[in-house]
Amino acid sequence: MLYRLRSLQPIWRQMRLSVAFPYITLLLWILPLLLFNSGQNSLMAHDEGLYAWRARQMLDSGDWIAPWGNAHHKTPGPYWIIASCYKLFGISEFSGRIPNMIAGILVLFLVYEISKILLAKNLAWLTGAILSIEFLWLQYCRLGTPDMPMILLVLLAIFSLIKAELYPKYSHFWTLIAGLSFGLGFLVRSFMIFVPIIALLPYLVLEHRRHRHLINPLLYLGFVVGLIPTFSWLWFNWQRYGNVSFEQLFKFVLDLGSDDRNHNGAFFYIWNIPLKSFPWFFFSLLGLVLVLRRPIPRYHLILVGFPLVMFAELSLFSTRLSHYSLCIYPFIAMLAAVGLNWLGRIYETGLIQKDIPTQSPLKKGGNIFIPPFLRVAGGNLPRNLSYATGVLGILLLLGAIFVFVWGSADIRKYAILGLIVGLGWLILPVVWISRYHFGQKFLTARYWIAGWLIPCWLALAVAGSLGLLGDYNPVYRTFLQQKAIASVLQTHPIYFVQLGGKNSVLLNFYTPIHGERVNTISQLPASSYAWIYTKNSLEPSKPYRILGKVQDYQLIQVIP
């Protein structure tokens, strides 16, 4: 058996040298995280449900301009993408999420390529692995929203600008692609595309004497070409609704910039980003310190300037939501890879000076660079972090056991998650103790770094398998799947009587045959069926019977 393994070593070595190997391994790393589910799906209200419902309206009506009967406040790119998937694969939650899954994979590959240029090849793969297991990032890779397609276009533009600088012979082509990406970004995300564009200005302006992107006419030509689909849509909208078409687009972005609809304060992202990217945000802070001490040649204003400027923009913007910060997450992953790689080398060598790869941004005279304030504690950090994660793992295991024994059936699935994640967090102390107390020197930095990646991967894989990343409204799903309710919905038009609340969009999407929208029950025909919102004070001017109730909504039938 040992002979066979040794005979396979040259084959494995050749595979690792293959150009496609990093992409294949990253794909194998993220695919289970995208696909694992409980076998049931339901949409997230409010945003995902809105995009799913509006895309379905386009497909059902055949009107791909404005099927809702009035001027719209958003550009139609996301609706066109989702509706196209409905046409190809049928109307379902999974079909609406396919574009984001594909975009998420392509973003992963782009981040790998960008990191390979900015950092080093080994750090590029680690960046991709970390990005895949950032919670908010993975969650939105599995949702039918426009965030991933926009980020794909933004990163494609950044990659193209870097390639244009690296290869002057093909700079016109790459600059055209950058402009085209920004133009198409407007189709996907409207004026929000200007947030990352502004975040790139430090690089574009302060490094202009070197790359001269801003005076390249193909950048602007590409931007205009990318705007053609949006201009075409606006033209058809203008023919129907006049100047209101333009007013709605501007009004929406002005409202977002002037009204804090969610009451998230100016410090929202200071706590939200660390929470939604745990634990990688804290590694990224270490990476940021290291990179600030030893700046990346040429691209420092991309690696550091872009996320910092974007963070400031989003904090100043009145409407603050978690997913607005998603453009920062690839850069958190890059900086986290720098920090984790540095800790891995300290784990393996302590504070002993040792050569590191020449492509690393953390080199100083060919030796490991240790900032002065970390020089004393640096050698203890890997050990302390290993033991801290072990304590966390034990606490999770104890909590999971407690829930299994005394918890209700509804929360026991969280106990499964706690049990598996708790076991995963024990990897780090086991690796540390095995190397430094039992002399297992084969447990190099790669094993220690894997001890960070594996528990996070397991946590998200189990969360997906339990339905926590795909089945957001199981109450509505189970209600609508009831035989008595499903038979009515499938065979009769359903009227809507002044539905309110953010979950009403779920009823819009899951109701196959729509009747009219009316203001009162008295407007309903005899024997008709309707959804009503119980929080509205409706006068029951006609007698009706309640067929079922889900939260604040009732399905009724008017008694003849």
Where does each model-flagged region fall?
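Transmembrane-helix signature of polytopic, membrane-embedded enzymes
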Residues: 19-26, 111-133
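Transmembrane-lumen/periplasm boundary regions of multi-pass, lipid-linked membrane glycan transferases
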Residues: 51-56, 184, 188, 193-339, ...
